[in-house]
Curated annotation (Swiss-Prot):
Lineage of origin: Bacteria, Bacillati, Bacillota, Bacilli, Lactobacillales
Cited InterPro entries: ATPase_NBD (IPR043129), Chaperone_DnaK (IPR012725), Heat_shock_70_CS (IPR018181), HSP70_C_sf (IPR029048), HSP70_peptide-bd_sf (IPR029047), Hsp_70_fam (IPR013126)
Source domain of life: Bacteria
Annotated gene: dnaK
Keyword Phosphoprotein in annotation: yes
UniProt cross-references to PANTHER family, sorted A to Z: HEAT SHOCK PROTEIN 70KDA (PTHR19375)
Gene3D superfamilies, sorted: 1.20.1270.10, 3.30.420.40, Actin, Chain A, domain 4, Substrate Binding Domain Of DNAk, Chain A, domain 1
Residue numbers bearing the Phosphothreonine modification: 174
Region (Disordered): 577-613
Stated role: Acts as a chaperone.
Keywords (A to Z) from UniProt: ATP-binding, Chaperone, Nucleotide-binding, Phosphoprotein, Stress response
Native species: Latilactobacillus sakei
Gene induction: By heat shock as well as salt or ethanol stress.
Protein name as it appears in the record: Chaperone protein DnaK
Length: 613
């Protein structure tokens, strides 16, 4: 069975891991980095992903970052040139890139993956993530929650201990907190909570706003109107945030950020950790309520938690660590890398699926309550939040009017009492209900949630046994046909990228061969026949002509022909050099012999003794 890779598809950075020898291992990207920026750029018809895309964000407007914030969002598209892309397609480009370098590392095709999502992702966002995997050519065997994955990475070697663990996960764009119970190889999620609109990007933005305000105050120029300046500010803000995790103040220096009446203007400011904490205190405070709610839903007090695990790059911020310590009364555990834990845990789950990991059971929960709209616009819950999945629940309803021929089933997810305030997952209709007074027909509505947290709903008329089912699709509205089309386009893009690389490699080979041929022909002058030299020159000219015409097939043929001729001539030159060396060696040997025969002088000697002795 091929390997099941674990992918942490993050807002700002992504990572991939695989199980080797019973232990999860991060797979480095082509640049040698253990995480890959979740950034995609489009340039000259080429799609670039990762660090190379992030580096050109300042100068290339066709660069997309933090697309995860919009996954599952109805109608959201990014326009690049004359083409529009859904968040699933952009995410698929990142996944495709990760899949490719994972295959290069493993030396085999990768078709199966476990992909992580924020614990507080709703059904639409989970389904959209699964669709992105499918577009990228991956069979997504399981969608698991990020905090749960971290706990898997943490607890893999601790299956004999019983612990209650709180995972605080503050990533680039989302925040989650989960409470789990670990024991005897069972990882049971007791509760989960979070905020899918809060993350490290917001901390960066707080610094950016501070820089914009101060620069405007000093120079009267609003940098927020300058797109290129704002990208430079974003990069500087991110760097300053990271610096302040280790130092008490940092210098932000951006020369030529703008221009005034008297010439260029430079941004030079010092940001202290104290000021940074003041700017972001409201963001840190926003994470407190989800922590307390998760503890409450788990039926635990903070002092009953054995371990606190920090996950996500933003948990390196000292104020965040201090806040978590104050709220839980526990010093956070730093035994796992917050940037890598999620991918490592996903790889462990991949090992469970492939059978490489035994005696580990993962029991996750649904993050939000599920139900339907009933009379008066009320949201009636069928499955409460933090119910262990997979699960199934049925409830019987009836008609609201006499002789009602059909019922509309409006499926919702959320915690608010009124249907209008919750997230619509889908609608469907059960028709052909026999005429009967109000309240007589018995309509059974059944919810099924699978292990990925994806919802199936059915409605059945118990009188006629007529049934209607719906698998809740992502509200982004991607049909199976659209997903298939996007998969085909993704494969074509990959093929086009491969072809483009082959073209570049061919042109580089040709340039190098022409240069090498010119050099070799100069060395061969007077050492091989004129006919042989002319043959090589003619072959070179034919290759130059094919190069100028950009005829790729002709270039391949002419390159191979010239390469063969040059190789033959080089071998000949080498043989000549060897023969000359041997001849020179023989002549030197003769000269030495002659000296021995003619130049040796025999002489007598006598011992001279010291007379003073």
């Amino acid at each position: 069975m091929s390997k099941v890779i674990g992918i942490d598809l993050g807002t700002t950075n992504s990572a991939v891991a695989v199980l080797e020898g019973g232990q999860p291992k991060i797979i480095t990207n082509p640049e040698g980095a253990r995480t890959t920026p979740s950034v995609v750029s489009f340039k000259n018809g080429e799609i670039q992903v990762g660090e190379v895309a992030k580096r050109q964000a300042i100068t290339n407007p066709d660069t997309i970052a933090s697309i995860k914030r919009h996954i599952g969002e109805a109608g959201y598209k990014v326009t690049v040139g004359d083409k529009s892309y859904t968040p699933q397609e952009v995410s698929a480009m990142i996944l495709q890139y990760i899949k490719k370098f994972a295959e290069d590392y493993l030396g085999e095709e990768v078709t199966e993956a476990v992909i992580t999502v924020p614990a507080y992702f709703n059904d639409s966002q989970r389904q959209a993530t699964k669709d992105a995997g499918k577009i990228a050519g991956l069979d997504v065997k399981r969608i698991i929650n990020e905090p749960t994955a971290s706990a898997l990475a943490y607890g893999l070697d601790k299956t004999e201990t019983d612990e209650k663990v709180l995972v605080y996960d503050l990533g680039g764009g989302t925040f989650d907190v989960s409470v789990l119970e670990l024991g005897d190889g069972v990882f049971q999620v007791l509760s989960t909570n979070g905020d899918t609109r809060l993350g490290g990007d917001d901390f960066d933005e707080a610094i950016m706003n501070w820089l914009v305000e101060n620069f405007k105050s000093d120079n009267g120029i609003d940098l927020s109107k300058d797109k290129m300046a704002m990208q430079r500010l974003k990069d500087a803000a991110e760097k300053a945030k990271k610096d302040l995790s280790g130092v008490s103040s940092t210098q932000i220096s951006l020369p030529f950020i703008s221009a005034g009446e008297n010439g260029p203007l430079h941004l030079e400011m010092t940001l202290s950790r104290t000021e940074f904490d003041r700017l972001t205190s409201d963001l840190v405070d926003r994470t407190k309520a989800p922590v307390m709610n998760a503890l409450k839903d788990a039926g635990l007090d903070a002092n009953e938690i054995d371990k606190v695990i920090l996950n996500g790059g933003s948990t390196r911020i000292p104020a965040v660590q201090e806040a978590v310590k104050n709220w839980t009364g526990k010093e956070p555990d730093h035994s796992i890398n917050p940037d890598e834990a999620v991918a490592l845990g996903a790889a462990v789950q991949g090992g469970v699926i492939s059978g490489d990991v035994k005696d580990v059971v993962l029991l996750d929960v649904t993050p939000l309550s599920l139900g339907i709209e009933t009379m008066g616009g009320v949201f009636t819950k069928l499955i409460d939040r933090n119910t262990t999945i997979p699960t199934s629940k049925a409830q019987t309803f009836s008609t609201a009017a006499d002789n009602q021929p059909a019922v509309d089933i409006h499926v919702l997810q959320g915690e608010r009492p009124m249907a209008a305030d919750n997230k619509t997952l889908g609608r469907f209709q059960l028709t052909d209900i026999p005429a009967a007074p109000r309240g007589v027909p018995q309509i059974e509505v059944k919810f099924d949630i699978d292990k990925n947290g994806i919802v199936n709903v059915s409605a059945k008329d118990l009188g006629t046994n007529k049934e209607q089912k719906i698998t809740i699709k992502s509200n982004s509205g991607l049909s199976d046909e659209e997903i298939d089309r996007m998969m085909k386009e993704a494969q074509e893009n990959e093929e086009a990228d491969t072809k483009r690389k082959e073209e570049v490699d061919l042109k580089n080979d040709v340039d190098q061969l022409i240069f090498q041929t010119d050099k070799t022909l100069k060395e061969l002058e007077g050492k091989v026949s004129d006919e042989e030299l002319q043959k090589a020159k003619d072959a070179k000219e034919e290759l130059v002509k094919a190069q100028q015409e950009n005829n790729l097939e002709d270039m391949k043929t002419k390159r191979d022909a010239l390469s063969e001729i040059v190789q033959e001539l080089t071998v000949k030159l080498y043989q000549q050099a060897q023969e000359a060396q041997q001849a020179a060696g023989g002549a030197e040997g003769n000269a030495t012999d002659a000296k021995t025969d003619d130049g040796t002088v025999d002489g007598d000697f006598e011992e001279v003794k010291d007379d003073k002795e």
